[in-house]
Amino acid sequence: MFNRNWTVPALLLATIIVPSLLPIRVAAQTGRSSPVAPRREVVAAVIQEAYDKFKDDKNGKNADYIPYLAQVDSKLFGIAIVTTDNQVLTKGDVNYSFSIQSISKVYTLALAMDALGPDKVFEKIGSEPTGRPFNSPVAVVDMPSHTGNPFVNAGAIATTSLIAGKDVDDKWNTILEFYSRVAGEKLTLIDEVYKSEAATNTGNKALSMLLAKYDRIYADPFESVDIYTKQCSVGVNAIQLARMGATLANNGINPATGEQVIKAEAIPHILSTMTEAGLYDGSGGWAWRVGLPAKSGVGGGIVAIVPGKGAIAVFAPPLDEAGNSVKAQKVIEYVANKLNYNLYSPASVGWK
């Protein structure tokens, strides 16, 4: 669908200006033709426009049901694009490490699919929108699958329970090491976030027991919740998150390391699930307005995938009522519309 072999000169470096007036460089190309190079200056300009347009937006509020998240500076705001040939364009607070939260669900799903195959995971977890809040116990009772999909909490806990290991620590290390390979660098647990969530995760424990009632959890319920809580507490910055997204855009190959981290056969299933359920109750409106697979987290991050081209990640803590970053949604919508990234638009095919 996408032709990645445009014959254009390899442009090596560019700069964009941040509020401190210090230049941030666009990473050097790897020598291949770039899906962003033909319009590199345009992309950088659009990022600048989006940053300026939405930086003072005061809508939304930080998640407050997790004490740590309520204390994060609500003014933090960073934008990063990573292309499938590892060009990096950034603006704002892109080096701040925030908790990945529900975006982790994407990559635990990928890990489970790599181990068991997409069809087996679909059989055990399902992939249907619930039409209810992401932490709803009612969906566990009402949905025929009882798990809904991998991106609501019940389905995510069940997905985490599929990860093999000799004990809890082994399973957790498998997940964290996999996330690091997708990010192209070592990721770590934000211990304060983990402790804050572990002290308030009674609802997720209740979900795990409901799953056990319906035989839809595949390891010890409370141990699975603990691992799930840890995966949500992993720290990422906007650049790392964009690279994790670009790995999906690049058919499972990390554009920084060249490693095939995720099996190519899993990518369409992951992206389709992101499209239908990636932004909680806002997923339908997102598909209507933006037309990109994406996943949000209550830590304030959203990553959106442009298959064959790259990914855009935005971090801004204030959330809407559905639990999605207000600024991140607006930025990605703006960039996608300006650059014709909408997958359902004919203009998104190739560069014109």
Which ranges hold each PLM region?
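Bacterial N-terminal signal peptides that target proteins for export
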Residues: 1-11
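Bacterial N-terminal signal peptides
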Residues: 10-23
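Short Gly/Pro-enriched turn/cap motifs at secondary-structure boundaries
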Residues: 69-72, 147-149, 199, 291-295, ...
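A short, well-structured edge-of-sheet supersecondary motif
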Residues: 55-91, 301-304
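Structured C-terminal helix/loop/strand segments within mature extracytoplasmic catalytic/sensor domains
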Residues: 31-36, 47, 250-352
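Boundary at the C-terminal end of the N-terminal hydrophobic targeting segment
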Residues: 26-28
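Active-site SXXK
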Residues: 85-86, 98-122, 244, 312
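Active-site-adjacent helix/loop patches that line small-molecule binding or acyl-intermediate pockets
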Residues: 33-53, 57-59, 112-231, 247
